[in-house]
Amino acid sequence: MKNDVISPEFDENGRPLRRIRSFVRRQGRLTKGQEHALENYWPVMGVEFSEAPVDFATLFGREAPVTLEIGFGMGASLVAMAKARPEQNFLGIEVHSPGVGACLASAHEEGVENLRVMCHDAVEVLHKMIPDNSLSMVQLFFPDPWHKARHNKRRIVQVPFAELVLSKLKLGGVFHMATDWEAYAEHMLEVMSSIDGYKNLSESNDYVPRPQSRPVTKFEQRGHRLGHGVWDLMFERVK
């Protein structure tokens, strides 16, 4: 389970320079269930990319705190979180259409109505569609670590991207990351700690225990059985 959604090379204004993406477009074959979900539930829960900023109150039909998840994979944990918090709104971005189809099918089956999904490049969505100071939470769980040194530049968590996320969070909003790759966790911590405007919510100024709000995935359970660690980082926008 590797969810990877943007190209982290930017100019001084935070705009993408070259389309070196942190994901590989492995669309794969849609199952009949995924195809059915895309055909039938996308018109209700799907959001097309637009050059114009989105109005969340219009999109969800109400005013409520908005959580954005970048790279939701097959959507199991995103649907679980949305179902557990009906008083909040959730927007998920995933570039792989089978995952989007699976998420739509699961949301429909669970009767989740406070979830919208996109199938697009996340950095473009952040730049073009997400208003500044609008998000209560941004979630990035298990992005591709690109562990080979020559691929490190493909990692989604870089200073310009973290600064972009900061601009989209409300004051008091939180950027929550999780990874099972220790070197990437250290990289995330270094990047986030270098940015003025974020406060690490860890009492030890590094990692936080997994919050109850983040479901344990099957991928994570398998990792625990194999002795793999998982690192959660939570940074609040304080200025």
Curated annotation (Swiss-Prot):
Residues at which S-adenosyl-L-methionine binds: 69, 94, 121, 144
Class of enzymatic activity (EC top level): transferase
E.C. numbers: 2.1.1.33
Region annotation Interaction with RNA: where it falls in the sequence: 150-155
Annotated PANTHER family: 3-DEOXY-D-MANNO-OCTULOSONIC-ACID TRANSFERASE/TRNA GUANINE-N 7 - -METHYLTRANSFERASE (PTHR23417), PENTACOTRIPEPTIDE-REPEAT REGION OF PRORP DOMAIN-CONTAINING PROTEIN (PTHR23417:SF14)
Family: Belongs to the class I-like SAM-binding methyltransferase superfamily. TrmB family.
Name the UniProt record assigns to this protein: tRNA (guanine-N(7)-)-methyltransferase
Source organism (scientific name): Salmonella arizonae (strain ATCC BAA-731 / CDC346-86 / RSK2980)
Gene responsible for this protein: trmB
